[in-house]
Amino acid sequence: MSGLEDIKNETVDLEKIPIEEVFQQLKCTREGLTTQEGEDRIVIFGPNKLEEKKESKILKFLGFMWNPLSWVMEAAALMAIALANGDNRPPDWQDFVGIICLLVINSTISFIEENNAGNAAAALMAGLAPKTKVLRDGKWSEQEAAILVPGDIVSIKLGDIIPADARLLEGDPLKVDQSALTGESLPVTKHPGQEVFSGSTCKQGEIEAVVIATGVHTFFGKAAHLVDSTNQVGHFQKVLTSIGNFCICSIAIGIAIEIVVMYPIQHRKYRDGIDNLLVLLIGGIPIAMPTVLSVTMAIGSHRLSQQGAITKRMTAIEEMAGMDVLCSDKTGTLTLNKLSVDKNLVEVFCKGVEKDQVLLFAAMASRVENQDAIDAAMVGMLADPKEARAGIREVHFLPFNPVDKRTALTYIDSDGNWHRVSKGAPEQILDLANARPDLRKKVLSCIDKYAERGLRSLAVARQVVPEKTKESPGGPWEFVGLLPLFDPPRHDSAETIRRALNLGVNVKMITGDQLAIGKETGRRLGMGTNMYPSAALLGTDKDSNIASIPVEELIEKADGFAGVFPEHKYEIVKKLQERKHIVGMTGDGVNDAPALKKADIGIAVADATDAARGASDIVLTEPGLSVIISAVLTSRAIFQRMKNYTIYAVSITIRIVFGFMLIALIWEFDFSAFMVLIIAILNDGTIMTISKDRVKPSPTPDSWKLKEIFATGIVLGGYQAIMSVIFFWAAHKTDFFSDKFGVRSIRDNNDELMGAVYLQVSIISQALIFVTRSRSWSFVERPGALLMIAFVIAQLVATLIAVYADWTFAKVKGIGWGWAGVIWIYSIVTYFPQDILKFAIRYILSGKAWASLFDNRTAFTTKKDYGIGEREAQWAQAQRTLHGLQPKEDVNIFPEKGSYRELSEIAEQAKRRAEIARLRELHTLKGHVESVAKLKGLDIDTAGHHYTV
């Protein structure tokens, strides 16, 4: 093993020496290693993965106390012991201990939840760990790349991320994308004997290689070792910071006003002033916000993984909630990717060849192992799959690649003659065979006929190789025939597309097939037939019919794109993003990686290549579109919970700051900082349960509308502050409650007033969560059981404190059950108007309030003739639509998009086109039924009531 230690210490240059010497130095053969040798070597070289930085658990725990919101609380704790002295009173130890407890509780919950989420994510990501084909014990098997050691023989094919530094063995040259390592944008050709680096992607070809370096000893490992990972501040973090800053600024304004009024104007005692400032600091900071939001996201991410969508980036959840356009691959996502060939429709273009021979040639030009869907269909059409290699000796197989779009087999027949067969895209095979114009015309006409029936075409050609070498170009190619391929739609695709449109997500089909096939599939799936060949939109030869319309608008209105190349996918995403859409893109191949990276949500479908998975944000573990739509719904529910909480947090900051500030300044009443601390602890304990609350997801794409969050928070918080001020005034300055409810007066007893205000603030503050969590009336939408139980327990504790407490240090005394009942009645009565305020804010912010006030009221308008011409035009257009003179879909073509409500109009228009396509199909069916009935002499009227259109 001393030789292997030299290799580990890099004293032997395995990159330059001849390949045979590599085997000698590594003490291995072309037959690979045994399992035992692999285990022995992993002890020497270590696992084939980069070293992960070990994070100190204690530092991670303390990290949850190191953010702007925590700093404010920590400042309050220091104030409680450092500044809160004077009047011969000791420092405020109760508040200090209470604040520290609150910080520790929050950090503990955050730490535990993040740890659990991290462990769950690690377990899920382990399932996505790079796999590789390795030769061990003389057998090829798929193993995790982490087990590789120098000396292993691996197989590299199109779409693979190369798992370790290796030297290529015999075979065709590889095209490798090294851009992740070297920044070279173009793929590099690597010949047998040359080195390939870990982390680069195979773009073309297939070959075996011997591993020479793994883990931290690879080129990639050394580079990663030198570069420290940079922490990019995500959108979610920016939103969190904005909300935190808003709350801190609100508190700062309140504190500034209190300091100016209390000391220079009112000449209050120093210690009383400090206590009032502590009330604002402790009560106003939403200390639980980072915890609640990260826990909500972690729980949501786990739920998504149970539905078959693994989130690689946690914040992809919020983007998924806002997604309004989904570009979906046709093959495998909208269809089953289970191809079949109708033998009767096979077309032969070569004399002396039967249809069965065309099928045999196609099967010969296919893999018999490690097959893709087309290979499996071709070989599966034979009576016995072994026929694909019967009586011939395989010399060389050219695998499929996105450039040539074909496969080929060079073989020797039983007579010793060399031949080559190829199957692939008809255009490529026609060019290969240098087809005459008349043959080309016949073939293209045949392809169009197939396409009208939704069938894809596969062409087959053959040639003789007189030179008898695999490298020789061979004789002229002969175009043999065309095969029709049928890929049936998934049984749930049509229903899922309908659901997506109802959710405001416009699904656009992306297919490499012809336009006619795309339209036929779109018609079958009920998604409309407004499709374009991507070359006509994005290529150099743009269609003259649509040249006058902006490309962005055409892409936005399209139901799908045909003849799509990977580079077109990137352009489609880019153009949609320029129109302010949140775009999701599905992909599976190595060439989809740029588009997946560019999209707001890159979705790697089930069985995607390593390269596609690496570039995506979400990896699906199950096939089909329904997984994506379920993930959209779940993401919106998660996002809704987060939004509900942020509105609540902003409202509470406003109500605490301005409510207690007004009470302190108008009546010079000093509320106890300790009682605010009790409110904060009970509130935070309850609010943690919102991460599992039952919510109604938004019916349209959703996003962080900070204007709406702040406006709602200010109005609801302001309303609650005013209600508390009115309650205090009524209890302190009037006998209203004594006269109306028969309770004893507490107007001159400050300690009992403290208990009464505490209970009123506690109830209405915590009940606010039911207003912010609902889209309609809060008493109609049932909350989750956990939230309800937590609320009841918290308010029971708050009521018992208010009724029985006798804490001299907190200046609070029990008020009895009579007052508690009165406060509950007051809180319930003042609770209901909050729903009305919530609806009013939403209506005003939507812009419709101003539009109806100014644009449609002639007294306020500035339009010529009071806008009579515009109103007449609107009426005429409505009448034309009503009487069928103008199709409904032509009305309201893409206004300026200012809101998600307008953005979802693209989905509404797609829905209308889909309905027209469906009715057209039914209309065709009805005509067909009537003609058959006439031929058969049936009574159509009796048959008519069996179906409706």
UniProtKB/Swiss-Prot annotation:
Taxonomic lineage from the root: Eukaryota, Viridiplantae, Streptophyta, Embryophyta, Tracheophyta
Sequence positions bearing N-acetylserine: S2
Subunit structure: Binds to 14-3-3 proteins. The binding is induced by phosphorylation of Thr-948. Binding to 14-3-3 proteins activates the H(+)-ATPase. Interacts with PPI1; this interaction promotes ATPase activity. Interacts with PSY1R. Part of a functional complex containing PSKR1, BAK1, CNGC17, and AHA. Interacts with CNGC17 and PSKR1. Triggered by SAUR9 via the phosphorylation of the C-terminal autoinhibitory domain. Interacts with AHA2. Binds to CBC1 and CBC2.
UniProt key word Translocase: yes
Protein name according to UniProt: ATPase 1, plasma membrane-type
Major subcellular location class: membrane
GO cellular component annotations of the record: Golgi apparatus; membrane; plant-type vacuole; plasma membrane; plasmodesma
Source organism of this protein record: Arabidopsis thaliana (Mouse-ear cress)
Catalytic residues identified in the record: D329 (4-aspartylphosphate intermediate)
Binding sites annotated in the UniProt record for Mg(2+): D588, D592
Cystine pairs: none
Catalytic activity from the UniProt record: ATP + H2O + H(+)(in) = ADP + phosphate + 2 H(+)(out)
Disruption phenotype: No visible phenotype, due to the redudancy with AHA2. Aha1 and aha2 double mutants are embryo lethal.
UniProt xrefs under PROSITE patterns: ATPASE_E1_E2 (PS00154)
Similarity annotation: Belongs to the cation transport ATPase (P-type) (TC 3.A.3) family. Type IIIA subfamily.
Phosphoserine: residues carrying this PTM: S899, S931
